């Protein structure tokens, strides 16, 4: 395959890199507030053997970032390519915006049949590449504090291995970590990769191990029936030492991410509220435990065990799972039942509606709790159309940006744009755009 040189510029310094194979050609825009850096593969021992790009989103009006939320894809070309849109996800942006954090999505350019461990084990060079990207993106975005702020890590499959590995390598930097369908190898794990030492500092990091029930939780056979067998030793190694770790299972899914974001984002929200320091450069705050809830492990797989305040729990810590708050405990119970976590909050109203001829464009933010399902457009006081007109999502609740297997918007990105083909020429119509979240609630 022909490869062409590409000139990239970071902080005014031109460097020569090589373009990606066709499957990784990235057409997703990276203009402010988005920023991107890409590194070519290295031939040096111990460094990353695959090319990688990192896309960063910075919320408007933030003078100094408090942290960075990292959305890490899994293994294989399809999952790796999904990382190209991760920083554009409006729902994850809502979480980052609330806590004055950036949102970062890597794309490791792993060939389909190549060894995923060569990037998803951060000891194989991806940790160093990540740290370099934070420095370079901090410079190009005008936020040099990016290289020292805490991280909130989300990872799917191989990304779960990566995020868990970063908890073990850099516990002082990780505010919280959500591991979907994957975890790194520790003593007792069946994985063949080199095991990690569980450092005491890692036990202070809130972690959630999340799976689909058909990944060996209640359904033991099938392609992904062995996933829980790899995750369970990690969970037990942590919880037996008193770690702040929980586990949850989607009753509707296997390896696809499904509706996990409706628990992951509230969980991450609670953890960031407990952990992020107000002053950049200060250490992460330790979780006091006064607001924590626990769930007895016996029967957790089907949601039969009820959460209870940790302060009144009389059982062994190692025989329970940890949750950061009563609100998250309530959401956990509903998620374990059917993933239909309720929401009573209205989404933010759209802004910046422009009408040029019969073309409407606007901007909108997602609801923190339930994301953005779509829009209702009114013309002259009456409903004109509901967008999307035919909502589809085979992996979970229908959302405006659509949803990939790996929890990112599909390509091409869906624009906030509508052409009113029935507009009367020469007449000035009055339009209104209303946001609708995935709980069905409308903006005012």
Where do the model's predicted regions map?
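Recognizes extended acidic, P/S/T-rich segments that occur
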Residues: 374-426
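Short substrate-entry loop that stabilizes the transition state in hydrolases
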Residues: 62-114, 186-187, 217-219
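A domain-start/cap signature at the N-terminus of enzymes
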Residues: 18-68, 99, 151-166, 170, ...
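Beta-strand-rich modules
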Residues: 420-441
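The feature captures the conserved acid-bearing segment of alpha/beta-hydrolase catalytic domains
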Residues: 175-262
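Alpha/beta-hydrolase active-site loop
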Residues: 118-145
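Alpha/beta-hydrolase-fold serine-hydrolase catalytic core, especially in secreted/extracellular enzymes
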Residues: 241-243, 251-351
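Pro/Thr/Ser/Gly-rich low-complexity, intrinsically disordered linker/stalk tracts
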Residues: 333-371, 425, 439-444
